[in-house]
């Protein structure tokens, strides 16, 4: 399983040493706040695919009253509606120049799988007479971009998974559990370079060379970040503490990034806490082995990072 590829193998890192977040952006429980919603510079046909599936999920959620479920259970309900969808590479590279929030419910990579399941779950927690694709795009914008806002700049997007954990904890959408879990260990001396080394694989970096130097500066911040993981050998003892809908980052032993993959924890009827993810190997979204069993399939896997999504009413 190669590391340095956007094929769902996302270098994970944080932005602790980045400029401070603007607290005025986080004064609402929901990205329906006007300060969060952005004008969409690209056509809806480019930024939103799978509208029929979107409406089918919304209809089912309404009929079965998913809104009353805890956020983790709601995420898994949404994730199950994505089960079996095809794996697709580079789903976020939708334009040569303009960055925009986007949704693709026809094909998913590992990042967009967990992100869209969480976005749908957050969206339906806010009671509305009718949901539109724009509602989901706002949720995606709120969690995908630094400060919860995209103005069209590629560098606004969170490109490394642990950055997502730290950014979203600051915003109150996800609790970053990893550092406080028993057995957590810091990953030291990690080179972060996936985006700049593989710039030819990314439409925006390939077509806008002026972005590469500032991307390298972000990677330098990322490399200095105190990122913790739960080592592989300690994960079996941790599995009973994992909850449905927890975001599970797969820590890697290789340089280039902190993580190589991401998915969701799901407890199945047999009582096993499994790893649900958009799989390159299976070419679709699958409910896989136990989290520890999945880790043990690959010698490059070092362990896991864990984030627990929070209810919309719990955001700051």
Q: What positions do the PLM features span?
A:
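Second-shell loop/turn segments in exported
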Residues: 60-68, 97-107, 252
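Mixed-charge, Lys/Arg-rich low-complexity intrinsically disordered regions
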Residues: 214-240
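Sequence/structural signature of beta-propeller domains
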Residues: 62, 66, 71-84, 92
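C-terminal segment of N-terminal export signals and the immediately downstream linker at the start
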Residues: 23-56
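C-terminal soluble interaction/assembly domains
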Residues: 249-306
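N-terminal export signals
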Residues: 2-3, 8-29
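Acidic/His-rich structured neighborhood in mature extracellular/periplasmic domains
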Residues: 88-220, 277
